[in-house]
Amino acid sequence: MDTASISSTSSNSKSSKEQIKYTFTDFDNDIKNEINELYSYSELSILKKSNISNQFYHDLHEYTSKNKWRDLTDIEKIDYLQHLIGFFELSMKGQDNYNRYLLKSRFIWYIAQGVRDETHDRKDQLHQSKLNCILLREINALPIILKTLVLSSQISNETLRNQQQQQQQQQQQQQQQQQQQQQQNENEGSGEGGTNFTTTTTTTTTTTTANTFISHGKRNNIIKNNSGSVSGVIKNINSNGTLSSSMKVNVKRADLLMSILLDIIYLIIINNKDDELFKEEIFESLEGCNNNNNNNNNYNNNILGKNNNNGTNCDNPNLISIILQLLSEFNEIDGNLYPIKKILMVLWKSLTIFMGGLEDLDRLKQERLDNVGYKKGTPKTRSYDISNFIKSTQRYHSQLKSNSVLHKVNTHYLGTPKEYKDVDVFRLPLSLSDSLSVLQTNLYPPEKVRKEIGINYYSFNNNDTITPHTQSDYFYNTSNISSSKKQIKPRILIDNPSNFERFYCMNVSNFSKIVIILLKILLAATPVVKNYTGPINLIAEIVIDQSSPGSSASLVETMQSAIDFLRHKEIISKSTLGILLLIIKHSKFNQHLQFEYLSKIMYESNALVLLYKCLNHESVEKYLFSQNYLNSEEYFNEESLPSSSAASPPPPPIFQPLNCSGSSINSISSGGAGCEGGGANPPPVQLFENYKNLFSTITSLKLIQKVMKHHPSRISSLSASKSANILKKYCSINHPMIRLYSLKVIKNLVPYQTKKWKQINMRIISDIYLEVPIHINDNWLFSHNSAINNNNNNSNNNNNNNNNNSTNNDNGLTDEHEVTLQEKVEEYHRVNYEQWYTNDGLDMCYKNDHSMGIGIFDDLLNSLQLTTEEKQAIENDRLAYIDKDEGSSLIFMNDALEDELLFNKWNIQKPKF
């Protein structure tokens, strides 16, 4: 190896260890990136070919006799916008006015994006876009656009049904013609064979052409669902750079009118997000926007009988309810052409603005702690930890009963007859007394915070203390409340509900359906799943334009479509995971039982298996630094910049691979030449962080931690060794949040690991000690069975068979905890929500059923779930995992079979709502 290669190797190894410069947030600091994600390359190509600017200026001159938008006064601008929106207020009786609606909506979109032809740089265009979107909001254009969006979805579904009926009729006619032709051939004599041969040949040719059309219409096999595999669009590329005749091109494109309307809605949302009054406008009902679609009776049935101040009356739906309705139709109506990426982006952005983003949530948490005088740096010690620490001492013994699970510390302390309440403990050293005083005054959580967020998260308190009832913990210890006390209002009738509480009231009976649909979309969008053939159609927005007769798509168009589709899936994954994390975090802040309900839905829907599957990449660095984009095809590309703004140099590269181990797509998308000439030292390719994949990775780790934390049954339902091997890859990534949450999840898995695993992975255990906050009495390093045996010895000294019954006792405690939690969740919903709805036959369900595919012990081949042998080994306490290689990881060998099983479990065609 020469000197140049050695120096290159050292520089690359040094650069790969540099910290990834990425800040985790749900709002992009640069609004240009959010707008770029909204448009696919194929959509931008269609908009360029449609010549919108010339048509817009022609229409503007006819109506205002002026040639530029900036020449208009504010009154003239409002008049022209009302003129365009006036077309949307007309009755849409069919497909006759579709082109006119599409043209006028494109004019409004052209104005909303800043009238690009009249701007000189990006900053000016973004400023004009904000002014125009504020103007659209002032003339109340958003409700009218939403009504048009609902009508366009109905037209799209009606057109789809008509096409299916026509295809069925054509198929029946062809079958009848074939039967008649066969009968004629049988009845005619042999002397007329020549004429019959000619007729038969003509009929056969016609039938072949018709059958080809029908196969596209029925979308058999891969094209049946316009599935999300790149191989569905790109197949068998010849050496000449053209597609072979066997390639199947998806001729179905997402509805253009719905796409352009969602673009306008998204631009209005992001340009008015700083206005506090806009939050209420998002949740305001639309008068006269009644949807008569029979496929969404769940929303129409959730009507409050006595309270409408929360915005839950779905006779007049709002922006969020309409988008959720489109999301439901996308899953239920087979073969629809909804632009699902835009639907998810609008839903995520509207929820973030209405409920508050992650930064707003952190600010609200800090305000809540400041109001009760709780400092963030206070030691988070619980009374349960202190009592266990005292009982674990060998010299002094507790005077409490052995079956006491949780008690206060003001009992007989350290064997002395004195209770410490407001005075020091008798005959104790001053240092120990001061330490106990600090622990007593800084218990976690404080009493004032308990009143606001509920009592201890997992409280099985057997003492006589009564937790005060507030609006946040209404049902706690209901048996201890005397009938003379004033009855507290249920949460659905409180005077000033939070925005998340209003959203929760509106969708309380549909959360199970919403979560499962999002998980199905996430499964279709994750890059780990190869050759996806499920029911979710993600490729309708990425379509190669039909070429002229006698020619085919070029190699450049084919590769552009492939990169566009990979980028498309990354954006969908980011939006889907962002919605799930936002709902989970707000539910935990609002009311803890709402969080338990949503996390239980995710767990019972096999979300843990899916999230681990999303993290199981062969090369994590390749995934985090993938370059699935074409800078020249972005909406805000470098070519549109003037020379003055493009003079700044690009940021330095973070990772520079020595060889072309990546795919040709990455080489083309990053602008490099790739492996040219097969040289030994090809030029390095500059790769930067993929912020979309970084966000998806951190969000997946956060969701795993929130779903399984403090739930031993959920942790033990998956193979701890296989899960840890996947997470070990992310511990080596030099990003603080990725390391922190991967170590947090591994910390939950350590008690279920073997001694050999702990010996091999001492580096990870040391990192957990250094980086993960640990409670004073957290015995996370103990084996799970050993900890259970110690508890059994403390609770019952006469039991001689603790080792044989440890697992059974653990299962009993776990089942009791899950059952108790489920009972509290059901009681909470019954008292606070269910009895205040006018049901009209509606069965409000607050738990998933096994018919929806939530069995955690159903076998999935070669997955994270426990096999029958592993379950038997755990029951006999003889399980031993063998790690041949420290860097080994789980590889899903049969993705198609596992996905098929997941789809069978996620059959929600007839949900129980």
From Swiss-Prot:
Gene Ontology CC annotation, any one: cytosol
BP GO terms, sorted: cytoskeleton organization
Region forming the signal peptide: none
A Pfam family: N1221
UniProt feature, compositional bias: Low complexity: 177-188, 195-204, 791-811
UniProt cross-references to InterPro entries, sorted A to Z: Far11/STRP (IPR040185), Far11/STRP_C (IPR021819), Far11/STRP_N (IPR012486)
Region called Disordered, residue ranges: 177-204, 791-814
Family (UniProt): Belongs to the STRIP family.
PANTHER family assigned to the protein according to its UniProt record, in alphabetical order: AT25231P, PROTEIN REQUIRED FOR HYPHAL ANASTOMOSIS HAM-2
Protein name per UniProt: Striatin-interacting protein homolog
Organism lineage string: Eukaryota, Amoebozoa, Evosea, Eumycetozoa, Dictyostelia
Gene that this sequence comes from: fam40
